[in-house]
Regions:
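N-terminal pre-domain/capping segments
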Residues: 1-67, 71, 75-90
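Active-site acidic/histidine proton-transfer and metal-coordination neighborhood
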Residues: 73-153
Length: 153
């Protein structure tokens, strides 16, 4: 078993690795951007290189990111669904650039209909995302939820 924590990327994504080392972490989770916004500023190529270098030097693994809390792959609202899929592809792009094992995501909240229908929407959205990025090594990591109404996972 490896123990890690979610670390801030304030000052650059590579700083999260340094913070993890200070706290004795063996694994790491980060947000690659503000988790309460749809889009983030592009990752600095120099920071990407430094992050990858620091991960390799420290042996911290696995390193993962957590997707924006705004993403809802279970929604039946077309505009929100499209925005969620686009945002999730962006999350995967960022994680792939950083060499992360995966992106942790809350699958979504059922906004209408049966939970089974919402689960199909989630699966369909993940298929769309993988079709958009078929060669990526970064995995989608579904985070379970408990006792949060119609939140699925």
């Amino acid at each position: 078993m490896r123990i890690g924590a979610h670390m801030s990327i304030a000052g650059g994504v590579s700083k999260a690795v340094d913070r993890a080392v200070v706290h004795g972490c063996e694994a790491l989770q980060i947000f690659t951007k503000n988790a309460s916004q749809w889009r983030g500023k592009p990752l600095d190529p120099a920071e990407i290189r430094l992050f990858r270098q620091r991960i390799e030097q420290t042996g911290i693994a696995p390193a993962v990111s957590h997707a924006s809390y705004l993403i809802n792959l279970a929604t039946t609202f077309p505009v929100l669904r499209e925005q969620s899929i686009v945002a999730f592809v962006d999350e995967l792009d960022r994680a792939e650039a950083l060499g992360l094992l995966g992106v942790v995501i809350h699958p979504g909240t059922c906004t209408a209909g049966a939970d089974e229908d919402a689960l199909r929407l989630i699966a369909d959205a993940i298929r769309v995302v993988y079709k958009a990025r078929p060669r990526y090594k970064t995995m989608v990591l579904l985070e379970h939820t408990a006792g949060q109404g119609r939140t699925l996972g």
